[in-house]
A protein has these predicted regions:
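Short catalytic/ligand-binding loop motif for oxyanion handling, primarily in non-cytosolic enzymes
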Residues: 37-39, 71-72, 103-107, 172-178, ...
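Oxyanion-hole/transition-state-stabilizing segment in secreted/luminal serine hydrolases
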Residues: 80-136, 170-179
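Hydrophobic, aromatic-enriched interface-forming segments
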Residues: 137-193
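Histidine-centered active-site loop/cap adjacent to the catalytic His
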Residues: 249-281
Length: 281
């Protein structure tokens, strides 16, 4: 019978941490963003990749992920000291990372990456992309991942050979669908206003985001190095896009940039064979 992924939160819920994990043949460590933890209110009742995972053996995940985490947050000692210390505290079967998505979404929301077409072809998605800013963002995310991955190799680490799994998100449809808490808009949308601000044609919105995301995610794909124990799970193209005018849960997406339970189940299905290949079943 499949076992649910038992998720523990050392920072959010330290009082719920067990005295030991001897009852779990498989112990995972996770850090990331809302694709691993919809944690605005400090709990994990909402779907995520982590709680969509099922295993053949009892499995626990120590999760340091928070909604809104950027790769910069994850790399900052002020935020990730607990996560970093886990490498020296106990041996894990795998480390799961979810980062880079919020770096991109925040940059778009703040007016970076996109630009008016100007004199360029207004029907070409590339005309609306500031490649200099996009390259700078890729470099920033790359440096942050290098910092995070370096903790695994510190002299005090018990996990120098522990496999690490990263992922590549998917292509969100720009649409008027904010994230909601208790049914009320809480934050977002992120993409649609940014595209409207540069007068990008509606018909090109998804193509522009796909082009930006594909380029941006190359910096994560570049870390794929199975010989070094680093594996990138290619999740792009897994989810069915929402309709461009949908204001709420639609297809595989609960809002503009977050999958729903069905979407996360599809993403978890992409993780399972990769986990099995490294002995986590």
């Amino acid at each position: 019978m499949p076992h649910a992924n038992d998720i523990f939160w050392p920072e959010l819920h330290p009082s719920l941490m067990p005295p030991h994990f001897n009852n779990y043949p498989q112990l995972l460590l996770a850090e990331g963003d809302s694709w691993f933890a919809w944690a605005y209110l400090g709990f994990d009742v909402s779907p995520s990749i982590l709680n969509a995972l099922k295993f053949n053996r009892p499995t626990a995940t120590l999760c340091y992920a928070y909604t809104g985490h950027t790769s910069g947050d994850m790399a900052a000692m002020s935020v990730s000291a607990g996560f970093m210390q886990e490498f020296a505290a106990r041996r894990f079967q795998a480390v799961l990372l979810s980062g880079g998505g919020n770096d991109l979404f925040n940059a778009l929301e703040q007016g970076s990456i996109l630009k008016p077409a100007g004199g360029a072809d207004p029907n070409d998605p590339a005309s609306y992309i500031d490649t200099v800013e996009l390259d700078a963002l890729k470099n920033y995310v790359t440096l942050n991942y290098q910092q995070i991955l370096s903790w695994r190799l510190l002299p005090t680490s018990m996990n120098k050979t522990t496999p690490v799994l990263l992922h590549t998100y998917d292509y969100p449809m720009p649409r008027p669908a904010p994230a909601r808490v208790f049914g009320k808009p809480a934050v977002g949308p992120w993409l649609l206003p940014a595209l409207q601000a540069v007068a990008a044609p509606t018909a090109l919105h998804l193509d522009i985001i796909k082009e930006i995301a594909s380029d941006m995610l190359d910096c994560i794909r570049a870390f794929h190095d199975p010989a070094a124990g680093i594996h990138v799970v290619n999740t792009c193209g897994t989810l069915t896009p929402a309709a461009p005018n949908a204001t709420g849960d639609d297809a595989d997406w609960v809002n503009e940039i977050h999958p729903n339970a069905a979407g996360y189940a599809k993403l978890a299905a992409k993780f399972r064979p990769q986990l099995a290949a490294i002995g986590v079943t």
